[in-house]
């Protein structure tokens, strides 16, 4: 059972009565065949549901209205099987508030060269039916995606599936509640922002709860529940001598388990799926939540440190998008550099809170060590290195008049040396196209020091995210050149200024 089982995508066929009942019968037959095949063979993340043909303005408007009010409907896939005059779609599209994709396909893959006639031509008119639909989308400034390809083509399946992930994540985001335990880290700018504007743009709500409210729940956790969770730790991780049953830090592990159980209970009771903490506001907690946060992220919760609610929300959104995909997604921070000509590297980490979903496939180490920040008892944490390979880091920032998403494509590499004195999870990567260009572009665009790191998602996923939410995106990859990047930022300033 995944979040995608809670949603469905409606498959809508556009046509008209001009061609007669027999043509519409064939259109319906083709649609049923295609939808059944896609549901069976395409490995789509959620189910396609075929709706009645859209052959008149009233029918199309009714479908769009019903889609808006059906909580299970994540979006619409439209196939213009025959020509479907686009003025019929204006009223429906003008009220539609769900994501929209045009599947530019046709029932047959190859033309029947010897038998093709005008009946065949009238039945299979995606080539210009899709263009008519595209015009009205452009004319109405209607954001929608387009996937071209035969319905049996695996590349088309992959692209539709990726769009479905965006559609579902958008619906989930509209219900997302972010809990901030305490406020922002004092005097930090980028983690702040306009929470009302964020709710208007994305749909998620952000509110603050006193740490004392959390502490009350944490203190209510009984020893039996703690013992059961400790048993899970024992079976899942390699515990250092200090954290084992007779170790001098065993009580710290028990306290970490108490915090994890209390946090999870608090989040579940409040319906929260993302949260923040800050080391400056821990009154009543015996240690900074480290292990608890790591394990909650692995269960799908969004998180960011120092009150950074935008990154916490983005992490939750990206975890929904990547559900079921290979690779993990985590809160991350660009921490320090390794400057070496031709081999510049970024070491990413945080004080404690890196998600185990990105870890190498080996038993993780559970340890308790001193943390100088926060002024509390030594916290428990999982220590690991990160899987290697292509990845991205993404940052969502508030520019006052709009949101900007920054994405840097990176290549995660193996740590060349052991890190015996670094008791935190970490990731090591090469930034594309190189560290000087990537860091300068990131800084010029205002990117945060907190990011979401993902092996599971790629640049195309984040481009779709920006499009479906109608926000700016700034991309840093192997094609980035600083003069052109600066120009793009200037052009975006003008474009979004005119768009307000």
UniProtKB/Swiss-Prot annotation:
Q: How is the cofactor bound?
A: Binds 1 Mn(2+) ion per subunit.
Return the EC number: 5.3.1.4
**Stored InterPro entries:** Ara_Isoase_C, AraA_central, AraA_N, AraA_N_sf, Fuc/Ara_isomerase_C, Fucose_isomerase_N/cen_sf, Lara_isomerase
Query: Which example biological process does GO assign this protein?
Result: L-arabinose catabolic process to xylulose 5-phosphate
Pfam families this protein is in? AraA_central, AraA_N, Arabinose_Iso_C
Chain sites annotated for binding Mn(2+) = 306, 333, 350, 450
- What quaternary structure, including any partners, is listed in this protein's UniProt entry? Homohexamer.
Q: Give the family per the record.
A: Belongs to the arabinose isomerase family.
Function description: Catalyzes the conversion of L-arabinose to L-ribulose.
**Name under which the protein is recorded:** L-arabinose isomerase
Organism name: Salmonella choleraesuis (strain SC-B67)
Lineage per the UniProt record: Bacteria, Pseudomonadati, Pseudomonadota, Gammaproteobacteria, Enterobacterales
The encoding gene is araA
């Amino acid at each position: 059972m995944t979040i995608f089982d809670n949603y469905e995508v409606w498959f809508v066929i556009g046509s008209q009565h001009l061609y007669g009942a027999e043509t519409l019968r064939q259109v319906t037959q083709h649609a049923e065949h295609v939808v059944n095949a896609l549901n069976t063979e395409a490995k789509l993340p959620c189910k396609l549901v075929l709706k009645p043909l859209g052959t008149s303005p009233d029918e199309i408007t009714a479908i769009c209205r019903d889609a808006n009010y059906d909580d299970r409907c994540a979006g619409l896939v439209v196939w213009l099987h025959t020509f479907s005059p686009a003025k019929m779609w204006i009223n429906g599209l003008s009220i539609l508030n769900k994501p929209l994709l045009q599947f530019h396909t046709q029932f047959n893959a190859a033309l029947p060269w010897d038998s093709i006639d005008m009946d065949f031509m009238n039945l299979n008119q995606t080539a210009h039916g899709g263009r008519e639909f595209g015009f009205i989308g452009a004319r109405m400034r209607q954001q929608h995606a387009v996937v071209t390809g035969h319905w049996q083509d695996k590349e088309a399946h992959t692209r539709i599936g990726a769009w479905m992930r965006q559609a579902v994540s958008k619906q989930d985001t509209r219900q997302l509640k972010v809990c901030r335990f305490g406020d922002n880290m004092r005097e930090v700018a980028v983690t702040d922002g306009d929470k009302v504007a964020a709710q208007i743009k994305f749909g998620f709500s952000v509110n603050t709860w006193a740490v004392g409210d959390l502490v009350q729940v944490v203190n209510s956790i009984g020893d039996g529940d703690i013992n059961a969770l400790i048993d899970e730790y024992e079976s899942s991780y390699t515990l250092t001598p200090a954290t084992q049953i007779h170790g001098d830090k065993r009580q710290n592990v028990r306290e970490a388990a108490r915090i994890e159980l209390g946090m999870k209970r608090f989040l579940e009771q409040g319906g929260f799926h993302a949260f923040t903490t800050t080391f400056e506001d821990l009154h009543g907690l015996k240690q900074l939540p480290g292990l608890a946060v790591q394990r909650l992220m692995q269960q799908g919760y969004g998180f960011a440190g120092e009150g950074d609610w935008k990154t916490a929300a983005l992490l939750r959104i990206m975890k929904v998008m990547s559900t079921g995909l290979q690779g993990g997604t985590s809160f991350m921070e660009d921490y320090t550099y390794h400057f070496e000509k031709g081999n510049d590297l970024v070491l990413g980490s945080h004080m404690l809170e890196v998600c185990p979903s990105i870890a190498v496939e080996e038993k993780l180490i559970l340890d308790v060590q001193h943390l100088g920040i926060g002024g509390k008892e030594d916290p428990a944490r999982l220590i690991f290195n990160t899987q290697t390979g292509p990845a991205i880091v993404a940052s969502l920032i508030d520019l006052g008049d709009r949101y900007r998403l920054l994405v840097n494509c990176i290549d995660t590499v193996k740590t060349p040396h052991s890190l015996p004195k670094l008791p935190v999870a970490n990731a090591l990567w090469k930034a594309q196209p190189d560290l000087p260009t990537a860091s300068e572009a990131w800084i010029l665009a205002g990117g945060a020091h907190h990011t979401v790191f993902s092996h599971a998602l790629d640049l195309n996923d984040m481009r779709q995210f920006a499009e479906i939410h109608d926000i700016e995106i700034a991309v840093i990859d192997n094609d980035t050149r600083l003069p052109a990047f600066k120009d793009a930022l200037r052009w975006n300033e003008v474009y979004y200024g005119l768009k307000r």
